[in-house]
């Protein structure tokens, strides 16, 4: 991994069965991490899927007849975890079968969540790493 400076580390794990969430943020002086990201096919260009957007930031669906809010499932502020416009994300569903670990297709159907997601902001050369265990 390219060399970055850790600028934030929050971890609430330690609850029942290790439940909790964590956020670690690294700042890079250049785009050396981007070069590594571009060689890994499991990193996807933003925007994220609707499911991942809901998990991290929450979404509101207004059909005209009803309003449904989903998420977020993390307790980080907009300052700690900003919405990134230009960048890449890497998702691992740690509860899924190994062949489905990079898919979020079934994640909203579960009573508990165990996932990791990395977000890289190309505008600020900042990497955000989030883990959620419920």
PLM segments and residue spans:
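N-terminal export/targeting and maturation segments
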Residues: 1-50
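Functional cores of ribonucleases/endoribonucleases
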Residues: 43-128
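Short, solvent-exposed aromatic-acidic interface loops
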Residues: 132-134
């Amino acid at each position: 991994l390219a060399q970055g400076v850790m600028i934030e580390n929050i971890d609430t794990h330690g609850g029942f069965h290790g439940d909790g969430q964590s956020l670690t943020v690294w700042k890079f002086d250049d785009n050396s991490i981007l070069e590594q990201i571009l060689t890994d096919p499991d990193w996807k260009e933003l925007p994220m899927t609707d499911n991942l957007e809901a998990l991290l930031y929450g979404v509101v669906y207004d059909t005209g007849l009803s309003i449904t809010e989903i998420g977020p499932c993390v307790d980080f502020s907009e300052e700690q975890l900003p919405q990134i416009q230009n960048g890449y994300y890497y998702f691992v569903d740690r509860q899924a079968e190994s062949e489905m670990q990079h898919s979020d297709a079934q994640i909203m159907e579960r009573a508990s969540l165990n996932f990791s997601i990395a977000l890289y902001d190309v505008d600020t050369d900042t990497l955000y790493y989030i883990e959620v265990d419920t």
